[in-house]
Amino acid sequence: MKFARFEINGWQSYAVVEGDQLRVIQGDLFGQHHFTDARYPINSVKILPPTQPTSYWAIGLNYADHVAHQIENLDAERIAKDAQAFMPWQKGVSCIIGQGDTVILPAESDYVHYEGELVIVIGKPARRITPEEAPSFILGYTCGNDISSEGSWHDDPSNWRKKTSDTFGPVGPWIETDLDPQSVDIITRVNGKETDKGSTSGMTFGCYETVSRISQFVTLHPGDLILTGAPGAVEALQPGDIVDVEIPEIGCLSNVVAAE
């Protein structure tokens, strides 16, 4: 089942995706809710980011192919060392944008690239859970684009600019609840040309392991998001580009790129 968050005429709600229609949900998606008879064509509404998370986590260097690409292009010694450890970090929730929104390239940045990823959507509070318990705490999955600037900002002591600048967190278009995350393709396209494709089967730390490890020290709340890593190579984005992140079982997240 696919759940979308949308806005029409200033009113926001959740809905279940039924073909090219949205069937409105009344109540709390993460609690008690029911389906109504109200429907809207998808093309008549604004699709919003699928949740409003309290935290937006990310796992870096989670695929061997991506590690190899980064070693080739960045600080090889540091990348090789970091890739051996589980190193989650937080992407600022203020950078989140949704389907069709614009990625803005900061005037000060000199190299901004995409990172198409699978995103975990937490469904209920999770604290000190095991990998085996993790599926029951996950509502579903969506597409994400971990927009990053690795140019002159690469050596920043934190990710505050290179990972969490405004608009650097596209996510959507909706949540798929019926998905086995262990072997799905992640496809990234720029201006219609495929630039990266990989499978979640190549993850070093799988989705259930990731949720479990983070929950040992941090309570995850309903609607929280976790980026699970880019599977392969990345390329620079330019003003006017259209970047798509597609996971066939979920849908396609599409955003246009513009200069500040």
Please report, for each region that a protein language model flagged, where it lies by residue.
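Hydrophobic alpha-helical segments and helix pairs
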Residues: 77-128
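Catalytic-pocket segment enriched in acidic/His residues
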Residues: 46-50, 66, 148-260
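RNA pseudouridine synthases
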Residues: 62, 119-144
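Structural motif
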Residues: 55-57, 86-88, 94-95, 102, ...
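Residue-level recognition of short, solvent-exposed, well-ordered loop/turn junctions
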Residues: 52, 58, 98, 113-115, ...
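N-terminal non-catalytic cap/leader segment that marks the start of a structured domain
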Residues: 1-86, 179, 189, 193-194, ...
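A generic local secondary-structure boundary/capping motif
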Residues: 46-48, 76-78, 103-112, 126-133, ...
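A short secondary-structure junction signal
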Residues: 68-70, 99-102, 107-108, 129-134, ...
